[in-house]
Amino acid sequence: MLPASLLRHPGLRRLMLQARTYAEAAAAPAPAAGPGQMSFTFASPTQVFFDSANVKQVDVPTLTGAFGILASHVPTLQVLRPGLVVVHTEDGTTTKYFVSSGSVTVNADSSVQLLAEEAVTLDMLDLGAARANLEKAQSELSGAADEAARAEIQIRIEANEALVKALE
């Protein structure tokens, strides 16, 4: 329950009273995958990479560790950490993406939704720039003014370490 002090704010009250509506495409149920198939949707705020595509396997980096997802995987919801998402398609091709964060949902019907805060193909990234950003962040860590600044720098370090690892 929200604290009463927040409810007195006119903007918040108006926000809480708004009716929620959905786009037709979002309200339509996802097509179920056939036996032994997995329906995969992968998107970022700026781009849709896969839209209910049948794929063989998806490898994802999560806060609890990296794992592969196949058809009939146990349902789960995981938070993504910076790292590589590897998609193995039915025709045998493999595509690698770098994600900064996000979530992955595996459903009982073998449908998988991966929503990334940021996602790019590896060919869009520069190893030299990632190394330079990593070195800069590491040098700034000791001079962090407070815990908040230190936490922000640590996040930059982790993201750039994952970038360097993905590109090497």
From Swiss-Prot:
Biological process, per Gene Ontology: aerobic respiration; mitochondrial proton-transporting ATP synthase complex assembly; proton motive force-driven mitochondrial ATP synthesis; proton transmembrane transport
Keyword Ion transport: yes
Gene Ontology MF term list: proton transmembrane transporter activity; proton-transporting ATP synthase activity, rotational mechanism; structural molecule activity
Modified residues (N6-succinyllysine): 136, 165
Localization terms from the record: Mitochondrion; Mitochondrion inner membrane
Keyword Cell division: no
InterPro entries associated with the record: ATP_F1_dsu/esu_C_sf (IPR036794), ATP_synth_F1_dsu/esu (IPR001469), ATP_synth_F1_dsu/esu_N (IPR020546), ATPD_C_metazoa (IPR048937), ATPsynth_dsu/esu_N (IPR036771)
Modified residues (N6-acetyllysine): 136, 165
Alphabetic keyword roster: Acetylation, ATP synthesis, CF(1), Hydrogen ion transport, Ion transport, Membrane, Mitochondrion, Mitochondrion inner membrane, Transit peptide, Transport
Broad class of where this protein is predominantly found: mitochondrion
Coiled coil segments of this chain: none
GO terms under cellular component: mitochondrial envelope; mitochondrial inner membrane; mitochondrion; proton-transporting ATP synthase complex
Role summary: Subunit delta, of the mitochondrial membrane ATP synthase complex (F(1)F(0) ATP synthase or Complex V) that produces ATP from ADP in the presence of a proton gradient across the membrane which is generated by electron transport complexes of the respiratory chain. ATP synthase complex consist of a soluble F(1) head domain - the catalytic core - and a membrane F(1) domain - the membrane proton channel. These two domains are linked by a central stalk rotating inside the F(1) region and a stationary peripheral stalk.
UniProt subunit comment: Component of the ATP synthase complex composed at least of ATP5F1A/subunit alpha, ATP5F1B/subunit beta, ATP5MC1/subunit c (homooctomer), MT-ATP6/subunit a, MT-ATP8/subunit 8, ATP5ME/subunit e, ATP5MF/subunit f, ATP5MG/subunit g, ATP5MK/subunit k, ATP5MJ/subunit j, ATP5F1C/subunit gamma, ATP5F1D/subunit delta, ATP5F1E/subunit epsilon, ATP5PF/subunit F6, ATP5PB/subunit b, ATP5PD/subunit d, ATP5PO/subunit OSCP.
PANTHER family: ATP SYNTHASE DELTA/EPSILON CHAIN, ATP SYNTHASE SUBUNIT DELTA, MITOCHONDRIAL
Record protein name field: ATP synthase F(1) complex subunit delta, mitochondrial
Organism expressing this protein natively: Mus musculus
